[in-house]
Curated annotation (Swiss-Prot):
Entry protein name: S-adenosylmethionine synthase
Biological function: Catalyzes the formation of S-adenosylmethionine (AdoMet) from methionine and ATP. The overall synthetic reaction is composed of two sequential steps, AdoMet formation and the subsequent tripolyphosphate hydrolysis which occurs prior to release of AdoMet from the enzyme.
SUPFAM superfamilies in alphabetical order: S-adenosylmethionine synthetase
Complex formation: Homotetramer; dimer of dimers.
Residues engaged in binding K(+): E45
Pathway listed: Amino-acid biosynthesis; S-adenosyl-L-methionine biosynthesis; S-adenosyl-L-methionine from L-methionine: step 1/1
The keyword ATP-binding belongs to this UniProt entry's keyword annotation: yes
Cofactor: Mg(2+); K(+)
Reaction equation(s) it catalyzes: L-methionine + ATP + H2O = S-adenosyl-L-methionine + phosphate + diphosphate
Residues given in the record as L-methionine binding sites: E58, Q101, D252, K283
Protein species of origin: Staphylococcus aureus (strain MRSA252)
Amino acid sequence: MLNNKRLFTSESVTEGHPDKIADQVSDAILDAILKDDPNARVACETTVTTGMALIAGEISTTTYVDIPKVVRETIKEIGYTRAKYGYDYETMAILTAIDEQSPDIAQGVDKALEYRDKDSEEEIEATGAGDQGLMFGYATNETETYMPLAIYLSHQLAKRLSDVRKDGTLNYLRPDGKVQVTVEYDENDNPVRIDTIVVSTQHADDVTLEQIQEDIKAHVIYPTVPENLINEQTKFYINPTGRFVIGGPQGDAGLTGRKIIVDTYGGYARHGGGCFSGKDPTKVDRSAAYAARYVAKNIVAAGLADQCEVQLAYAIGVAEPVSIAIDTFGTGKVSEGQLVEAVRKHFDLRPAGIIKMLDLKQPIYKQTAAYGHFGRTDVLFPWEKLDKVEELKDAVK
C-alpha cells in the first residue's frame, strides 16, 4: 500500500543569530532615518563579526542619524551586554562606509519612464521602480495566520526561546539560537503532526546538556506547540552537538539579507532572491514582496483559493509591473486569469501606489527584522490586513 504522507521542514532563528543581528541593525538605521525623513532613500548593509560591526551602503536623506548610537542600542536590546557573551554593545568597534544613492538610479525612481515626457505631478504616476526584479507573496488557509505551519511554529518557538531568556525563566541562555520544525502532511495535504523539532540554543558554560534539554522541552516546546500535533513518534533534537557556548558574531560572521527564507515562507513558496532589511520602500524587493503577500492573503481569506502564490515583476525606472502571475496550485474556486484581472482592478501595484496603499513610509521595519515579516501574531503590519476580501469576492462574481 502506498504511503501518500509527506514531510516538509522550515527553520527560524532568534534575534541573536548573527545574520539577524545584521538585519535588525540595518532596519533600525532605516527606521531612525524614516522617522525624520519619510522620503529618504536607504540601502543599508551590515556585517557583524567578533568585536565589530561594519555599516555600508547608499543613503540619501535630509536628516542626521547617529549611526553608532543606533547600532549599540540595537545590540543592547538583542542581549549582547557582556564581553563574556563574545559580543558587547559597549566595547565593540563600529565602522561606517556610507555613500549617497547613485544619481543614475535616482533619476529613474524620481520620474518613471512612462511619465518622463509628460507633466505628471502625481507621485504615484511619477515614481519608478528602484530596480528590476521579481517578488513572490504567498498565503495558505492551513493556519489562522495564513502561513504554512512549519514556518509559523518555527517562528513561535524561536520567539519563545528569546522570551524565556529575557524574562529570566532560563537565565543561562544566550542570544544566539536556531529552530527547525518538520511537519507531516496527510494524503489530502493537511498537516497532521510534528515529526521532528530541532532546537539549538547558545548557553552559559556551566549548565549541563541534560538540563538544557529538559528545560527547552518544558519551557519552550510544550507551551508553544499544540498538544495534538506532538505524539510519541515526534523526535526532539536539542543542542545535538552537545555544546553551544561560543555563538553570535564570535561564532559566525553575520550579514544583512542572508535569512531570506526565514523572513518569508520557510521554503514553502518561491522567492525572487531579494532581501528586505535595510531597504526603503521605493525598493520593490521589499515593498512589492509585501504587496504580493497582501494580495495572496486577501485572495485566500476571500475563499477564492486554499493557497495562493502571487508573482510581481518590475523594470528599473518603470512604474507599472511588467507582469502579474497567480498560481493557486489547483485549489482556486475561479480561474487564475479572473484573479489577475481582479487584482489589477483593486490593487495599485506601482511602487508609489504600494507605498500609499500599505502606508510604508512609517518607521516600522526594525520589528519586521526578527521572527518573520509575515503572519505575525504580536504585531499587525499593514500588508497583513484583510480589507480587500469583499472587493475581490464581488470582482469575480
